[in-house]
Curated annotation (Swiss-Prot):
The active site is at 2 (nucleophile), 605 (for fru-6p isomerization activity). This is Glutamine--fructose-6-phosphate aminotransferase [isomerizing]. It is found in: Cytoplasm. GO terms for molecular function: carbohydrate derivative binding; glutamine-fructose-6-phosphate transaminase (isomerizing) activity. It catalyses: D-fructose 6-phosphate + L-glutamine = D-glucosamine 6-phosphate + L-glutamate.
Amino acid sequence: MCGIVGAVAQRDVAEILVEGLRRLEYRGYDSAGVAVVDAEHNYTRIRRLGKVKELADAVETAHVVGGTGIAHTRWATHGEPSEVNAHPHVSGDITLVHNGIIENHESLRTLLQERGYIFESQTDTEVIAHLVEWELRSSGSLLEAVQKTATQLEGAYGTVVMDRREPERLVVARSGSPIVIGCGVGENFLASDQLALLNVTRRFMYLEEGDVAEITRREIRVFDARGEQVERAITESNAEHDAGDKGQYRHFMQKEVFEQPKALINTMEGRITNDSVVTESIGVNAVEILNKVEHVQIIACGTSYNAGMTARYWFESLAGVSCDVEIASEFRYRKFVTRPNSLLITLSQSGETADTLAALRLAKERGYMGAMTVCNVAGSSLVRESDFAFMTRAGTEIGVASTKAFTTQLAALLMLVTALGKQQNRISKEKEKEIVEALHALPAQIEQALSFDKEIEALAPDFADKHHTLFLGRGEFYPIAVEASLKLKEISYIHAEAYAAGELKHGPLALIDAEMPVVVVAPTNDLLEKLKSNVEEVRARGGLLYVFADEQAGFEADESMKIITMPHVSDITAPIYYTIPMQLLSYHVALIKGTDVDQPRNLAKAVTVE
């Protein structure tokens, strides 16, 4: 949820560190800081509450020089947003940044206070700094001190430590919070996300759980949780160097909404032919595993959970395989029963979602036949720890409110469902061809849906002055309504809820009045007539109706109901298609409200703490 950048080089690194933080702004933060030391042990630390630009201005004014440094953007967990709580934190000659949550920080704080340490901040991070300083007194090296400290920490952390007396060395420890090392020539870097380093290197080494690494200009030494030196593979990244550029768009979210046709094409490339899904493209051993699957368990959070809820309808109606979907933070704390031949599927844009990772690790101990992830970031923890991965190829997603990651997850899941049904002879060749043709048509249809931008923008003022909004859908369009309500909440700060339309009589009707906009997703399918009855229930109680309706659905607009007529598309891919106008509506409402669309308050892009 926070951002870390570090560098050991012969050149001055302050500008590299600040630029790295700029590239991580999308993750969400409330303060930022940097610390740099030069070869003569001259040391500078600068922290600022607010945006990275304020830190950058301060660094430029101070003429910060030095070849070794660390930088951080903080998203407050322990302690309010303030300059004193901002990272880096200091203890003696030790300077440190940290992502994660130290669960035993209170007992460690008490212990350290008894040893005479004085705390300046409210953070759990300062505990780590003092611990390292204490252990260094009896250790032969900074590496050893960090290793000893790591054994005392409970919780999640990715931490980078610098000793101003050793100005050409950084030590990093990882447990539950991602750290990637960027490998250069005569210089090395590290970050919590490779995006921070794409302007300085394309070669990356991903640390595993429990790793501690020592980094100098010319050497990277990695030690596992047992303290044994190990080799970690270096991979070449093909991620977009200019992912942090909005181009012609006002916001990253807007850019990413309009990138969805291309993202879908990329996700489907090489995975579908003219009339079939290429099962082997889903992952290593996919054919063998899918032949045996009797049940699917999906685990996810947030938008990814909504994608899983949509896919459940496909798994059961198309592939004939039972499917359960659970929120990761709930799944891991209940006593669940593992069904025979059950395939575990995790969904995550970042591949680093803390609760999803923890649920995966728990589930792997409980007898699932295999663990698959649908993910957007190659080399992420979920990808490395799963048996096989189906990458979504959406490209870097900067906006906190997920858009193209959601629709590409849905496309990937639909291909998976089709492959599963085909392998088990539950989907005929004719049905497979119908699904594939619908997928082929989808990018052009999404382009068409994006052309409704101006029409949807005209609706936004009707929502911007309201305090609540209700979204309705039936069947597989209920999760789409849930996702729509989440988007409106995230970026416009309007309270929004979604209900399966058949539940109106069981409570939500009590909320309906002239101040409650009700958005309805209305494709032409078997549930249309029942949905029309639900719409009439809202109309009869004076609700403000906004119906996104298939052109064949037969709705007629009047003073109480606005109709946005959508071209007819395949029932199979319609949930993906109807997502687009929901995204556009939320975006335009947020513009009127004047909120921070790309970095909504209190939210972070990658939730790497529990």
